[in-house]
């Protein structure tokens, strides 16, 4: 028995006609490009995308067809790094306390994710616009009523900056604010290269000096002061020991002032920070890889001390008794009980024009 062949020969004229109607390679490439661009565009409309290159470091929220029954909690992303760390930790703790899932704004993710291994999912603006949020204002410290917020879709507001919100979850907060390996390793490599009078130090004290806008805001708005030369002398002397002298690693958003006002004649002070407020990762990592902390004022220094552990010295009583700052700030809720406060010299600091 004979079988028909698997192919049919075409006459030359038919072959030429087929070639004439077959699309060219450039046409196929163009159509494929249009298909890919269209697919990406439609996916972008449906998914809550996060700006590169850190999109992989957190779960991304898809716009829901129906709002989840368990609710959704988020928080306003206000301020720079220290403020947003406080907001993140507060959202993490209060949402857990109230049994609600927590989501962070994309803006907060862009600030924190390049530095830390945060885990909360990201709430894109396209999702946020579909949620019937109820704003819930927080004071700067924890209150009992925050443990029972009977609202499913909450947007927390304010500038919470107190350990009283989350200290009972300290280990979880430290895990959330674990540095990325490359950030930590760069800081550790810098510290390993430091020498005190020719010897490698065994103890590092991170020093953060807040200057910048606070130089104007504290006296003009809050009837207060920033750290002066006298405070920093006392704070560094508190850590100096004759047997195992530490090295002081100074960071600040006013490095020129620090070089003029911090005595480095003993050879144990290193002016290490770059002072760039827009890219704080290097300075923050250096502080957290030290053993102890000298802070002045502000949330950046607080978080450096909180993550570092060890001993912390801070500037205390830096506002006048009638300062409006006392309406929004409680020192006992801002500084851990075991930290050591050195009282600011209000008179000398105000006269010096700081």
Swiss-Prot record:
Subcellular location: Golgi apparatus, Golgi stack membrane
Catalytic activity entry: a beta-D-galactosyl-(1->3)-N-acetyl-beta-D-glucosaminyl derivative + GDP-beta-L-fucose = an alpha-L-Fuc-(1->2)-beta-D-Gal-(1->3)-beta-D-GlcNAc derivative + GDP + H(+); a beta-D-galactosyl-(1->4)-N-acetyl-beta-D-glucosaminyl derivative + GDP-beta-L-fucose = an alpha-L-Fuc-(1->2)-beta-D-Gal-(1->4)-beta-D-GlcNAc derivative + GDP + H(+); a neolactoside nLc4Cer + GDP-beta-L-fucose = a neolactoside IV(2)-alpha-Fuc-nLc4Cer + GDP + H(+); a neolactoside nLc4Cer(d18:1(4E)) + GDP-beta-L-fucose = a neolactoside IV(2)-alpha-Fuc-nLc4Cer(d18:1(4E)) + GDP + H(+)
InterPro entries hit by this protein: Glyco_trans_11
EC class: transferase
Membrane topology category: Single-pass type II membrane protein
GO cellular component: Golgi cisterna membrane
A Gene Ontology biological process term: protein glycosylation
Transmembrane segments: 23-43
Family, similarity comment: Belongs to the glycosyltransferase 11 family.
General remark: There are three genes (Fut1, Fut2 and Fut3) which encode galactoside 2-L-fucosyltransferase in rabbit. They are expressed in a tissue-specific manner.
Domain of life: Eukaryota
Organism expressing this protein natively: Oryctolagus cuniculus (Rabbit)
Tissue and organ expression note: Salivary and lactating mammary glands.
Predominant subcellular localization, coarse grouping: Golgi
Keyword Transmembrane helix found: yes
Chain's role: Catalyzes the transfer of L-fucose, from a guanosine diphosphate-beta-L-fucose, to the terminal galactose on both O- and N-linked glycans chains of cell surface glycoproteins and glycolipids and the resulting epitope regulates several processes such as cell-cell interaction including host-microbe interaction, cell surface expression and cell proliferation. Preferentially fucosylates gangliosides GA1 and GM1 in the antrum, cecum and colon and in the female reproductive organs.
Designated name of the protein: Galactoside alpha-(1,2)-fucosyltransferase 2
Residues carrying sugar: 197, 291, 317
Higher taxonomy: Eukaryota, Metazoa, Chordata, Craniata, Vertebrata
């Amino acid at each position: 028995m004979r079988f028909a062949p698997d192919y049919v020969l075409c006459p030359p004229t038919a072959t030429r006609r087929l070639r004439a109607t077959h699309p060219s390679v450039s046409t196929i490439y163009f159509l494929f490009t249009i298909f890919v661009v269209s697919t990406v565009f439609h996916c972008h409309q449906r998914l809550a995308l996060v700006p590169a290159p850190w999109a992989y470091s957190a779960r991304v929220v898809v716009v829901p067809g129906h709002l989840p029954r368990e609710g959704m909690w988020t928080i306003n992303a206000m301020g720079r790094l220290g403020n947003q760390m406080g907001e993140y930790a507060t959202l993490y703790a209060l949402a857990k306390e109230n049994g609600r899932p927590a989501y962070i704004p994309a803006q907060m993710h862009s600030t924190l994710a390049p530095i830390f291994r945060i885990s909360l999912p990201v709430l894109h603006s396209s999702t946020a616009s579909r949620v019937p949020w109820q704003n819930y204002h927080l004071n700067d410290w924890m209150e009992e009523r925050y443990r029972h917020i009977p609202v499913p879709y909450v947007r927390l507001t304010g500038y919470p900056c107190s350990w009283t919100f989350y200290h009972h979850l300290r280990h979880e907060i430290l895990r959330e604010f674990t540095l990325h390996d490359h950030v930590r390793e760069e800081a550790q490599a810098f510290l390993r290269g430091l020498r005190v009078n020719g010897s490698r130090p065994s103890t590092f004290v991170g020093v953060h000096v807040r200057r910048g806008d606070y130089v104007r805001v504290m006296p003009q708005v809050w009837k207060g002061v920033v750290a002066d030369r006298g405070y920093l002398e006392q704070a560094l002397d508190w850590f100096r020991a004759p047997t195992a002298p530490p090295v002081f690693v100074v960071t600040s958003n006013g490095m020129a002032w620090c070089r003029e006002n911090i005595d480095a004649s003993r050879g144990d002070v290193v002016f290490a920070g770059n002072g760039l407020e827009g890219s704080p990762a290097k300075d923050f990592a250096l502080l957290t890889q030290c053993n102890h902390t000298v802070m002045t004022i502000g949330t950046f220094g607080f978080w450096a001390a909180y993550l570092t552990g060890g001993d912390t010295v801070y500037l205390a009583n830096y506002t006048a008794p009638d300062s409006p700052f006392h309406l929004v700030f409680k020192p006992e809720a801002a500084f851990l009980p075991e930290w050591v406060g050195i009282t600011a010299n209000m008179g000398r600091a105000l006269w010096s024009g700081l």
